[in-house]
Amino acid sequence: MVLLLTLTLLFGFILALLIEPIIIKISFKKGFFDKPNERKIHHSTHIPRLGGICFLPITAIVCTVMLSAGFRLEKHWIIDIFSPHQMHFLYFAVSAFVLFCFGALDDLWGVRYRTKFIGQVIAGIILCVSGMWISDLHGLFGLHHISPVLGFPITIFAIVFITNAINFIDGIDGLASSICMLALAYFTIVFYLNENYDYAIISVALAGPVLGFMLFNLFGNPDRRTKIFMGDTGSLFLGFALSVLGVAMNRYTGGNAHYNSFVLGFAPVILPCFDVMRVVLVRRRQGRNAFIADKNHIHHKFMSLGLSQHVVLIIVDILTIVFAAMAIVMAQYINVNIVLIVLLLMWTGLNIILPNHFNDKKE
């Protein structure tokens, strides 16, 4: 199984290395750039923005090939995919494709944020219809098993919230993709340890193209036309995928009495969720549109200290790991609601200490 997971990662990674240069070439030919403006870090350079458009196709190809290989080599577990999880995977593919289309339209021609929001809700509804919804909050807000009447709206809200959290935090090179890589590595390990091998393969299949993209995003040179951004296609798809994996983990790891399954499912995305929640509240308090981007995210706060993008990337990734680890460990010993309060207080304190505004001159 470890060999199969490794081959899955390499397959997706190699495909991304082959496809991303083609996307860059087409982007320059057709003029699909991230437009420079005063808000963006790269405010003086035209850089292609379609790096994430290959995530879904590569993931689909890799999953099809490797799950088929697993069926031939490991029939004792893979056969389960074609019974209870069959509809979940099918509906996940359909809902991911819906969101992929909305993201691609935005990257290619631009669409209003309300349109993208509608697409996210549609994707969430499709997933709930498949039977993949949050049926147990494991003590959060004092609730445990819940009915579809409550579970469906909560699931759709979680999907939209996490999807936007990843989309919003995609502000400096490698940040959204590295957070997603950390989350996917985590999901792979936990699903593997819980013998949910099908979801482990899906997690690795998602990680491969993201890892390949990161090489071009982090180390590409704009002057040599080797740099590319993820775009909304990539960030929306990855945010949606992480939310679905979180819902799946919440449903299928309930047999472990030592860990809170709700925390297990959503611990990797705590930091981006806290960040988007704070940013939206600040924008609304200032009377601004919650979906109009600014320079008030956690990475902007660190950059206002004069730190480079790569240093900020490492700091935020470390914070992501710290918040996730603390949530998982604390939830073993204390009430999940107290865990949430403690983490919120830590996050609030961190944002109070850091500067309130991004200073362009320091950048």
Task: Give the predicted meaning of each segment.
Residues N250-E363:
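C-terminal membrane-associated helical module and adjoining short loops/tails
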Residues V2-V276:
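"…together with the soluble PPM/PP2C metallo-phosphatase catalytic core" -> "…together
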